[in-house]
Amino acid sequence: RDCVRLDGFNFGNSPSEYTRDRVENQTIALTTTNGTRALMACLDAEQILIAAFANFTTVVNAIAGHARVNIICAGTNGEITLEDTLLAGALAAGRNASQQNDQALLAIELWRQCKQSDDLNQNIFKKLLVSQGGKNLQQAGMVSDIKLCAQLNTHSILPKLSSHSKIIQL
């Protein structure tokens, strides 16, 4: 939707719009181009968690004890995205499972390359800038959103999607 707020919606694409004072104790109807499809494809899963760099450690701790974890990347318009793959690699590496499929191994390698930096948040930011999603946000004048999304562990919330109600609980 080209990073543009839809008519009739109170919030747009920017995570900076979703401040505590605006969303706390509110019911939010959210639609996305790609994320909604990815979440709906997971409805048969035992548990559906939503991850970002912002809640990285919380999600890693939540999945640590599970024997099998599927990390689903939403992508963009049916394409693999760098930002999704980087986060998937971070989650898979953080989980430290004894067996990984090839997709996980590729994502983990991307994450390991990114981690080779004194300033991990800055390195994540640089990776996100060169991704297609990052380029789209730059064209929309939303570089500050990329910077915000590149910050690790700014939140400890664990969003869970109920497969029955299709409501995300924080």
Question: Which positions does each model-derived feature cover?
Answer:
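Structured catalytic-domain cores with a bias toward divalent-metal coordination
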Residues: 5-13, 26, 65-72
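Long, charged alpha-helical interface segments
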Residues: 10-27, 31-33, 41-47, 82-170
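Acidic (Asp/Glu) carboxylate-rich active-site/surface patches
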Residues: 35, 41-78, 83, 87-93
